């Protein structure tokens, strides 16, 4: 999958953008605040219907404008699509695929599998379990066709159950939801466990390349006692859940944990090592998608050079090139990209929201 053309209007500080991209590497060069991260954000938004920088729409739409518009032409093998997204200041989102209305953001997400590597992305390792659940669920969204429907229904039932608990309703009023909730919980957990098991060897292998001095181990935890029946857990813990006003145990508490030398990685690794581990996770997941589904991710890498020495930057560049994926990389100077010795590339300068091709 690759974006061949991108149009951006009224998005942050970017002047109207109309760019053609290389299917391999695209480098965005500019000072801090110039708009290069905003372009990555626009690409990410086109594939996710949300920002990785802000949840507040009014901060993303250009000042005094009613909406922003994103349009992309994408291609994969012999197939081509035209996709568009418009976000209104009052919150509505309009999605078009090949000129047709009525599409969902999930349709865009399926067309554009993306891996994001940013300085803030270390929350995957040192943040709460929700970040690691999202990592697993991203993979399942692209690998298991029934996952998104099951995941959506699971979250809907959990919200309904929690609302009933907060209203102090008796178990007789909640029991009807618990049967279906338990069924979905077991299915989602089974998928997560299978995906984690399939991905773990690739993660550990990639970690050996980036962090050979460490032994990295991964493990999946489903969010309730292993081998226990979740329906029985819901029954047994009803009074506790009602006192808490929410469902304490379940797939909403699942985690995908990483340890180095037997200890949590956030307690052992330096910030630079954590970034390398994050890169290893994203690369392994993208390569797993290619191996299993013959689909390439698009990699978005913000501030490529930060916290990586010259050797590790060269290693990351080589692995990205081997992946065959389309890659977007930001840097302050071309010098920071000297390890990116690639034949197929385009270079862009970014200054005060204006983006120009350099080659």
UniProtKB/Swiss-Prot annotation:
InterPro entries: DNA-binding_RecF, DNA-binding_RecF_CS, P-loop_NTPase, RecF/RecN/SMC_N, RecF_2. One of its GO terms (cellular component) is cytoplasm. One of its GO terms (molecular function) is single-stranded DNA binding. Transmembrane segments: none annotated. Keywords: ATP-binding, Cytoplasm, DNA damage, DNA repair, DNA replication, DNA-binding, Nucleotide-binding, SOS response. Signal peptide: none annotated. GO terms for biological process: DNA replication; DNA synthesis involved in DNA repair; double-strand break repair; SOS response. It is found in: Cytoplasm. ATP binds at residues 30-37. The RecF protein is involved in DNA metabolism; it is required for DNA replication and normal SOS inducibility. RecF binds preferentially to single-stranded, linear DNA. It also seems to bind ATP. PANTHER family: DNA REPLICATION AND REPAIR PROTEIN RECF. NCBIfam families: recf. Belongs to the RecF family. This is DNA replication and repair protein RecF. It comes from Haemophilus influenzae (strain ATCC 51907 / DSM 11121 / KW20 / Rd).
